[in-house]
Amino acid sequence: MEDRYGREIRSFRLSITPKCNLKCFYCHKEGRNEEHGKLMSADEIGKIVKSSLEFGVRKIKISGGEPLLRTDLPEIIENIKDEQIKDISLTTNGILLEKYAQKLKDAGLDRVNVSLDTLNPEQYKKITVGGNIESVKKGIEKAIEVGLTPLKVNFLAMDCTVNQLPAIMDYCRKIGAILQIIEFIPMEPELKHHHIDVVPIEEEIAKSADQVFTRKFMQNRKKYLIDGLEVEFVRPMDNTEFCEHCTRIRLTYDGYLKPCLLRDDNLVDVVNPVRNGEDTRKYFIKCIEEREPFCKAQ
């Protein structure tokens, strides 16, 4: 199904918990800054995802908080697995990944994205307020070992991390991971000074790239191949291209459909209709009708 701007719905991002085992100072909490409501059950998540297939969803991304804190995560994955779904991936900080990688693979997870903003142990501990970078590295190694690939490393480009980019690139090249460089969205005014423009970084990468590809169904993102390393950029801020080609809807941890990453004022309750035994199609239709580009071309 297309929205009124002609954008197909192909991807569904599920936040399954607001809780996290780290306290990264920059976290935007998937656009939900306050904890409220109760978590959806594995069964409810499964029913909501199965309903989304009618509207064209073919890719699922599981996120949090930290999704590995849900002890029923393998059950959630099993419940959403369907032959119509081409890809189920998960975004994690990697702290618990070594322990659970095999169980997730066995449940039907295809691949993982792991957040890693620095390779400096002390800086990592400072950014995450106590995180152990060695646990993350071991988790990445285990994920690759069990076949949760292609593994992506999510690098958040900020004023305090950008000097780590060359080392992160070398690390990803060495382990065979894809590097995703993400623009920082400051959700609070006091964090604005950490934002940097990633356009010049992308321009430099483009100059050195051996090949450049365009991902049509991922906001027309460019993918750069440079010395054997795949690099992608995610630039949601003031980016008309990002919004114009968006194919994703979202589900909050407490069961609301979220038409736009950057808005929190047009959510559509879907979990209570599920709990009441209602047909959820009209709620998906309402969500899709609410979609409009946050950043529009002038």
From Swiss-Prot:
This is Probable GTP 3',8-cyclase. [4Fe-4S] cluster 2 binds at C243, C246, C260. It comes from Methanococcus maripaludis (strain C5 / ATCC BAA-1333). The lineage of its organism: Archaea, Methanobacteriati, Methanobacteriota, Methanomada group, Methanococci. GTP binds at R13, K61, T91, K152, R248, I249, R250. Pathway: Cofactor biosynthesis; molybdopterin biosynthesis. It catalyses: GTP + AH2 + S-adenosyl-L-methionine = (8S)-3',8-cyclo-7,8-dihydroguanosine 5'-triphosphate + 5'-deoxyadenosine + L-methionine + A + H(+). Signal peptide: none annotated. PROSITE patterns: RADICAL_SAM. S-adenosyl-L-methionine binds at Y26, G65, S115. It comes from the Archaea. Belongs to the radical SAM superfamily. MoaA family. Catalyzes the cyclization of GTP to (8S)-3',8-cyclo-7,8-dihydroguanosine 5'-triphosphate. Keywords: 4Fe-4S, GTP-binding, Iron, Iron-sulfur, Lyase, Metal-binding, Molybdenum cofactor biosynthesis, Nucleotide-binding, S-adenosyl-L-methionine. Residues 4-227 form the Radical SAM core domain. Its EC number is 4.1.99.22.
